[in-house]
Design a protein with these regions (language model features):
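Alpha-helical transmembrane segments of multi-pass membrane proteins, especially transporters
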Residues: 23-31, 50, 54-62, 80-88, ...
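Transmembrane helix-bundle core of multi-pass membrane transporters
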Residues: 80, 84-151, 178
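Interfacial loop-to-helix junctions that mark the boundaries of transmembrane helices
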Residues: 22, 48-52, 122-134, 206
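Hydrophobic core segments of alpha-helical transmembrane domains in multi-pass membrane transport
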Residues: 3-10, 31-37, 58-64, 88-96, ...
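Terminal peptide-recognition signature
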Residues: 20, 66, 72, 90, ...
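Single transmembrane alpha-helix segments in multi-pass membrane proteins
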Residues: 1-41, 55, 59, 63-78
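Helix-loop-helix "hairpin" substructures at the membrane interface of multi-pass membrane proteins
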Residues: 127-204
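Alpha-helical transmembrane segments in inner-membrane proteins
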Residues: 8, 45, 64, 69-70, ...
Length: 207
């Protein structure tokens, strides 16, 4: 299911012909944001509040990681393939740095299962299904992305920019804004994939 969500996240970027090869990095920073909240706030917050914060934090982290190369592409016409690919390695180093402080047990060089005793921050079962929330969230994003790309004005702008930026400018579409917005959406969804991996599946994080 997580792979499907990643594919959904990449859809608008690829439709715009922005070759986002940085999904791995966006997933890692989203997962790291989720893990940080589970570790530092898991035992001090009500579960619903913690879940919302984890979801929002992973979304924001992924969006930031997606917007960075989009800004450089929009204003300096950098190569997005290389830029997003290199950001993957930056994200890996950030997670590796965090693992040093989060390792459990000490000296293991792994985070281990986060909150294994309390299960704080773990997505609960839904309808008796362990991964029920994962399925529901992915289905919601699948349907939402279909509506967004097929029927919304922004989805139309993505398609036009992907076909021809000159045509988009002629149609008075703000190309720079479309690139940045679309990569924010793409990165944000990939960040949520990191949330599902950490909170809803493995309950740990690694590179």
């Amino acid at each position: 299911m997580v792979l499907l969500l990643i594919a959904i996240g990449l859809t608008p970027a690829f439709k715009m012909k922005f070759w986002n090869i940085g999904a791995e990095g966006q997933i890692l920073v989203g997962g790291a944001a989720t893990a940080a909240l589970m570790i530092y706030a898991g035992d001090s917050m009500p579960t619903p509040v913690l879940m919302i914060l984890m979801f929002v934090a992973s979304l924001a982290a992924g969006m930031i990681w997606g917007i960075i190369p989009a800004i450089f592409k929009a204003y300096f016409n950098t190569n997005e393939t290389l830029f997003t690919l290199m950001l993957n390695y930056v994200a890996m180093q950030i997670v590796t740095f965090c693992i040093v402080y989060w390792e459990n047990p000490a000296g293991s060089n792994t985070v281990g299962i986060i909150n294994s005793a309390t299960r704080a921050g773990w997505l609960p079962a839904l309808g008796g299904l362990t991964y029920g929330w994962n399925v529901l969230i992915v289905l919601a994003f699948t349907f939402g992305m279909y509506i967004y790309m097929k029927y919304s004005k922004q989805g139309y702008e993505v398609a036009v920019v992907g076909e021809s930026q000159d045509t988009a400018r002629y149609a008075r579409i703000n190309v720079k804004r479309t690139i940045i917005r679309t990569m924010g959406i793409s990165g944000g969804i990939c960040g949520i994939a990191g949330f599902l991996l950490v909170s809803g599946a493995s309950h740990t994080i690694s590179t």
